[in-house]
Amino acid sequence: MPTHRVALIFGGQSTEHEISIISARAIANHIDTEAYELYPIYVGHDGAWFKGETAQKVLDLDMPAMLANTSADTIRERLREISFSDPRNRFLFDFSEEGIDVALPIIHGSTGEDGKIQGLLDMFSVPYTGCGVHASAMTMDKETTKICAEHAGLHIAPYTTIRKLRYQQDPQQVVSVILEEFTLPFFVKPASQGSSIGITKVHRPEELAAALEKAFMVDTKVLIEKTIEGREIEVAVLGNDSPVASVPGEVEPGGDFYDFTDKYINGKASLHIPARLPEEVLQKVSTEALKAYRALECRGMSRVDFFIEHATGKIILNEINTVPGFTGISMYPMMMDASGIDFSQLIDRLLQLALEKTLS
C-alpha cells in the first residue's frame, strides 16, 4: 500500500509547456506505485490548475508525436478542450484536503523553475523536490548564475547584458556597441529561458537585430555571450547537504548548437555517456559541477552544463538547470542511470530528499 501521495505538477505558462507534459508522463510511467500514489495536477497555459480526469487526459497525450506532426496552435487548442471539459476538475490549492504529502513540480522554465511555484508550495507547507526559492531564482537568471559562479572561482564565458528598454530607445546604437565589443560569431540569449528557447548564434552583422528582437519576445533582459569553441559537457547532480555528481555526459549537436529542435524533435544530436574525455578530466568536471551546485545553493537536483574549450582546455560553466528534462532522451536521468541510479530509483531518491529537506 502506498505510503505517500505525490502531487505531480506539470504544464505551466512557459514556452516549455509541452516538454513538461512529456517529462511528467515519463515520471508517471516509472514511479514506484507500491510506495507512492500519484496525484497529477495540470497547469494550463493560462495558469489555471486542473486535477483528476482532466490532468490524467493531458498526461496520456502522445506529446512527442504531436510536437513532430502538429502545429503549436492545434496542440494548444487540444489542451484547452481537455482543460475546460469538466469545470469540477479545477484545482484550488487544497493540498491538505487532498492529502498531498509531497510535490514533484516538473514545470520547466518560467513560473516552474524560477522560484514561483517553490514559493507557493512553501506557503502551503508542502515538501517538494528540487531546489528552493532562492536557488531557483538565481539559476534561472543566466547573468546571476555567472556572477555567483565567477565569485566561486569557476570560469565563465565573457558576456554583457542588454535591457529591452535600452534597446527600444536606440536599437542601432545598441547593435553598434555589441558589434564593437564582440567578435563574430557570438550568441544572443534570453536571460531566463530554458531548452534554448529564443537563442540565436549570430554569424553576420545583419543578423543581430533580428536575434535581439527574437530574444526580447520572451524576456526583458538578454545576454550577449562569446562563442566558446569546445565540447558541450553536462553533469547530473543529486542531493542536499552531501550532493553527488553523475558521470559526465557529452552532447554533440546536430546543427549549429544544441537547440530546441535538436533536443526534442529531430533527434539529430549525438549523446555520449560517459563523455569522451580522459578519466582525470571527467573527475575534474564532476568536481566543478559540485562546486557550482554549492555556489548557487542548489538542493535536490540540478543539471550543470559546461564547455571544455578546445584552445585552452578550460572547463567553462554554461548554465545550471534546476528542473532538467525527464523525457526519454533527457540527459539528467540518462546520466544518473549510467551512474547506477535508474529512473525509478531516481524518482524515489528525489522524493526522499524532498522529505529530508522538510525534516532538516
Curated annotation (Swiss-Prot):
Annotated signal peptide: none
Domain (ATP-grasp): residue spans on this chain: 146-352
Protein keywords: ATP-binding, Cell shape, Cell wall biogenesis/degradation, Cytoplasm, Ligase, Magnesium, Manganese, Metal-binding, Nucleotide-binding, Peptidoglycan synthesis
Residues annotated to bind Mg(2+) 2: 319, 321
Cofactor note: Binds 2 magnesium or manganese ions per subunit.
Cellular location(s): Cytoplasm
Gene3D superfamilies: 3.40.50.20, ATP-grasp fold, A domain (3.30.1490.20), ATP-grasp fold, B domain (3.30.470.20)
Reactions this protein catalyses: 2 D-alanine + ATP = D-alanyl-D-alanine + ADP + phosphate + H(+)
A Pfam family matched in the record: Dala_Dala_lig_N
Chief place of localization: cytoplasm
Cofactor(s) it depends on: Mg(2+); Mn(2+)
EC number, UniProt record: 6.3.2.4
Residues bound to ATP: 179-234
Described purpose of this protein according to its UniProt entry: Cell wall formation.
Family to which the UniProt record says this protein belongs: Belongs to the D-alanine--D-alanine ligase family.
Protein name as annotated: D-alanine--D-alanine ligase
Organism: Prosthecochloris aestuarii (strain DSM 271 / SK 413)
